Regions:
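Core of compact, soluble alpha-helical bundle domains
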Residues: 2-146
Length: 146
């Protein structure tokens, strides 16, 4: 017989099921490490920087400040105690004219970062849903063909 009873295993399962995404990701420090890698990755991605507006923004905005706001936003969206204090996604991205292909590159970078840190599938799916909820405010709709 092992050192754990069935009751304690059931308790562990129940605790894991009731924890917020924020808690399951390890809290602000773990989230900040992942965001740090992700922002470093997107700041130099040639697929994103091919858009001159994005490239200019990447050179105008402090990477450290960008990392702060993204960390704050992820923590807030994942159920942490933080409150996002940055601009709306629409206001922050409206002038960048981000295309669907650039969104795809951004998502690819995001998935590479999650894989690097071994983020489990359940948490990846929840993070994907959070990111996907911002797409309509970030991607500029294509102009209709004339």
């Amino acid at each position: 017989m092992g050192s754990h009873s069935i009751g304690s295993e059931e308790g562990a399962v129940v605790a894991a099921e009731t924890q917020s995404l924020y808690e399951r990701l390890g809290g602000v420090y773990a989230i900040a490490v992942v965001v740090d890698d992700f922002i470093d990755r997107i700041m130099v991605d040639p697929r994103l920087n091919a858009n001159p507006r994005v490239d200019e923004a990447h050179h105008r905005v402090s990477a450290q400040g960008f990392k702060y706001y993204v960390t704050e936003q992820v923590c807030w969206a994942a159920g942490g105690p933080q409150t996002y204090s940055g601009r709306t996604m629409l206001d922050a991205h409206r002038e960048l004219l981000i295309t669907g292909a650039e969104w795809g590159a951004f998502i690819d970078d995001f998935h590479q970062t999650l894989a690097k840190f071994g983020v489990p599938e359940r948490e990846r799916a929840e993070l994907d849903a959070i990111i996907e909820s911002t797409k309509d405010d970030i991607v500029t709709p294509a102009a209709p063909a004339v």
